[in-house]
Amino acid sequence: MNPSERFFSKLRKLTVYLETESSSLLHTSQNLKEDEEDEETGAQALYQLHSEVRALKRQVRDQVATHDTSSADLRSFIRRCLVLKQRTTEDIDSLKKHYEKYGYRPRISRLGSTEVNCTKEAEERAERDAEKLDAAEEDEETERGDCDKVDQSVTPEKMPPPVDQLQTPKLSDFGLSALQFQRVLGEAEVPLSAAPESAIALSSPPILMNLQPPQPKTPKCSLSMEEDALTPRLEDFGISEYTMCWNNDFTMDLFNKKPPKNRSERNENVLKPHNVFSNTSSVLNKDVANKSLESPEPPEFCTPGFKIAKNHVPSTPLFNGKNDLNSPPRLNNNCPSTPELPAFETPFVSKLIKKEDREEESKIHSESQENSLRLPDLSTTNGTSWNDAPEMPKMLRYEEEALPEMPILQSNFGSSLAFKNTSGESLSRMKTGAGHMLEMKQTSVPVPEDGFNQDWCLSTPKVRVKFPAEPCTPEMPDMSSVTQDILKLVAQCKY
């Protein structure tokens, strides 16, 4: 049912309802004077009628709006379909034109030819049917007239040959009688009747065939290539170019072992003067050279403050002519890690000892002056050992007549010292341990500004027996500079 028909049917019902209500309202309006109740009922009915009419109007408006939207959607859909149809027809025409270049015949022409043929066949069939009807009518008439005549049986043209279902199938049953197949064993049979020429021209098989037993074919086997084979998992044995040098075992170390050195040679190596701290390159070369399995010895470290247990060696640094005396003091490789007492006694160290021990120190000092003082040989670079070093010149007596020329001292303590300035003072000859005599030059020392004079004496190092409760360790650079100043004085006295 169309929406327009539904709309008009509802409208007709509404008009009928309005007419009935209007008639009832007219009737009630004419009879207003009858009862007050009738007036109230009439007003209520009118109000209900107005409300119903308003509701119907709203409903009609909604239906019209929905009908308009649906019709608009339908129109847009139809337009889209028409546009799509036009596009498809254009595409089909372009494809037909493209395929016609390659011999394509459109379907319309084929349908036209088939329709023409069909119409011709239909006309012929209609004519045949009409002829058959005429013949049937004539036959009926003849049958009615000749009822007494014996019906002659019509024999069939040809009876189909009987078919044996259990017969073995032949090539002719499958339409393959025209083809000639070669037998695997034996001679080929010559066909009795010449077969009709077929479209496929096949060469006739030879009459005499080589009677050889059929050989079994070699089975096809896929060749396994080395490239396709799975590669075995590589095992890491830890051998590489970097780790080849680690494979030197203990036996090779025994072959490369060198004979142990004598104690004198070791002392030479120990006392050999270095440039106080050895360079990294020399340390590396030394490590490479000491790969032989010698008896275990404590290694030599250049790091100050690292404690190791090693043999006691003289803590006095060796004097090297190549070293610059103006350079800051350095530590020797043979210097122990813990700070030791200086090799020579100075007045500054005596202040660190308590007053109770000064008497004992004076006795030890007087005894030590009588003993000889030995210094290491300055030519240790030429390969001489510590035992061949000359002895320290022995001080016979201390005269105040003459003093040696005071050199430029490096330590703070040495720079603060002052010496007595006497023009006629001189030192007597000092007898060495080897029997040689060493002469000191008669020089004058300038008097410092503060006017403080103090005697300078060379003595053997004293042994500290008692220490204070909390002894303060002197700074290593100051003590080493003091010893360096003493070495300067000794070198000046010798040369």
UniProtKB/Swiss-Prot annotation:
Protein's GO biological process: attachment of mitotic spindle microtubules to kinetochore; cell division; chromosome segregation; mitotic cell cycle; mitotic metaphase chromosome alignment; mitotic sister chromatid segregation; regulation of microtubule polymerization or depolymerization
Record field: compositional bias (Basic and acidic residues): 119-135, 355-368
Region ranges (Disordered): 119-165, 355-391
Subcellular location: Cytoplasm, Cytoskeleton, Spindle; Chromosome, Centromere, Kinetochore
Keywords: Cell cycle, Cell division, Centromere, Chromosome, Cytoplasm, Cytoskeleton, Kinetochore, Microtubule, Mitosis, Phosphoprotein
InterPro entries, sorted: SKA3
Main location: cytoplasm
GO CC terms: cytoplasm; kinetochore; meiotic spindle; mitotic spindle; outer kinetochore; spindle microtubule
Keyword Cell wall biogenesis/degradation: no
Composition bias type Polar residues, residue spans: 378-387
Residue numbers of Phosphoserine PTMs: 295
Entry keyword Hydrolase: no
Molecular function (Gene Ontology), one example: microtubule binding
Gene3D superfamilies: 6.10.250.1400
Subunit details: Component of the SKA complex, composed of ska1, ska2 and ska3.
Reported function: Component of the SKA complex, a microtubule plus end-binding complex of the outer kinetochore that stabilizes spindle microtubule-kinetochore attachments, promotes alignment of chromosomes at the mitotic spindle equator (chromosome congression) and assists suppression of the spindle assembly checkpoint. Kinetochores, consisting of a centromere-associated inner segment and a microtubule-contacting outer segment, play a crucial role in chromosome segregation by mediating the physical connection between centromeric DNA and spindle microtubules.
Family note: Belongs to the SKA3 family.
Name of the protein this chain belongs to: SKA complex subunit 3
Record organism: Danio rerio (Zebrafish)
Gene this protein is translated from: ska3
